[in-house]
């Protein structure tokens, strides 16, 4: 038997729908509303701030939500499907969504870019210097091509990856270029998605974040737009509640405690 909402719960539910849109409400939120209406109310207020300001177009906000809900480590299939459906209803194309997913998949490079420097330090402490050897002609060509395509950008991390495994460097660089070949999203839109991916708590990468912030600014993004990306990404924390509370309700039901 469905429980009747209290006056406060009804008020909170309507506020949530008014702030976030009717498409956002689901049975999951009914469960959270039942157990803790106060957190639903406070979340509706804080998470709707970017929507009310609207520095980013709605389609761009959908790109950000799709990206952060599809990141390995914070994958939220329920939220991802909801944002995809809403994006499609808004007129976003399948190709645009695919490109957002392709950009998000690049997060795998963080393991290599953060791990290789640690390996290099460990090797150096043992008297092994990978950097001492000259790059061969193929490695020099790969480096020159990368620098040319990325406006002069190069880091010690990429240098070390190139030295340790040029085949991997070449293949992953080609993989990274995939979203830039289709041209569906603008350079600015791509960079804002990259910022979201590298600013997510589970995949935070300060160097990559700084690089893509500069690229976004160069592509015409404003400070307000970038701040709004951060605000959207910060809502990732709610997954602890949206995923955890329904499981808590199941446990309570199975133990006949509610």
Language-model regions: role of each:
Residues 72-83, 104-119, 201-212, 233-249:
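Short amphipathic alpha-helical segments at helix boundaries and their inter-helical linkers
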Residues 81-96, 213, 217-219:
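A cross-kingdom feature marking solvent-exposed beta-strand/loop segments within repeated
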Residues 133-136, 227, 231-233, 238:
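Alpha-helical transmembrane segments and their immediate juxtamembrane flanks
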Residues 1-60, 89, 112-189, 214, ...:
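Acidic, glycine/proline-rich low-complexity segments that act as flexible tails and inter-domain linkers
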Residues 61-76, 190-205:
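Amphipathic, charged-and-aliphatic alpha-helical interface segments
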Residues 96-101, 225-229:
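Membrane-interface alpha-helices at helix entry/exit sites of multi-pass transporters
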Residues 54-61, 77, 94, 183-187, ...:
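Alpha-helix N-cap/helix-initiation sites
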Residues 172-174, 193, 201-202, 206-207, ...:
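Extended, charge-rich C-terminal regions with high alpha-helical propensity
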């Amino acid at each position: 038997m469905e429980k009747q909402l209290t006056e406060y719960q009804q008020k909170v539910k309507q506020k949530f729908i008014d702030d976030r849109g009717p498409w956002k409400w689901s049975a999951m939120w009914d469960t959270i509303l039942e157990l803790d209406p106060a957190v639903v109310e406070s979340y509706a207020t804080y998470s709707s701030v970017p929507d009310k300001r609207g520095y980013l177009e709605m389609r761009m906000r959908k790109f950000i939500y799709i990206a952060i809900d599809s990141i390995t480590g914070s994958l939220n299939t329920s939220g991802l499907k909801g944002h995809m459906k809403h994006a499609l209803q808004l007129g976003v194309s399948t190709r645009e969504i695919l490109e957002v997913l392709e950009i998000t998949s690049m997060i795998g490079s963080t393991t290599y870019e953060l791990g290789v420097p640690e390996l290099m330090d460990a090797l150096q402490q043992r008297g092994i210097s990978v950097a001492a050897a000259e790059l061969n002609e193929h490695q020099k060509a790969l480096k020159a091509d990368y620098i040319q395509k990325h406006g002069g950008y190069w880091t010690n991390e990429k240098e070390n990856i190139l030295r340790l495994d040029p085949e991997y460097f070449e293949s992953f660089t080609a993989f990274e270029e995939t979203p830039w070949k289709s041209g569906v999203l603008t350079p600015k839109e791509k960079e804002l998605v990259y910022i979201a991916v590298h600013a997510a708590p589970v995949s935070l990468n300060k160097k990559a974040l700084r690089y893509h912030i500069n690229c976004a600014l160069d592509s015409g993004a404003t400070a307000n737009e970038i701040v709004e990306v951060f605000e959207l990404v910060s809502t990732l924390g709610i997954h602890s509640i949206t995923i955890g509370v329904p499981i808590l309700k199941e446990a309570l039901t199975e133990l006949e405690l509610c």
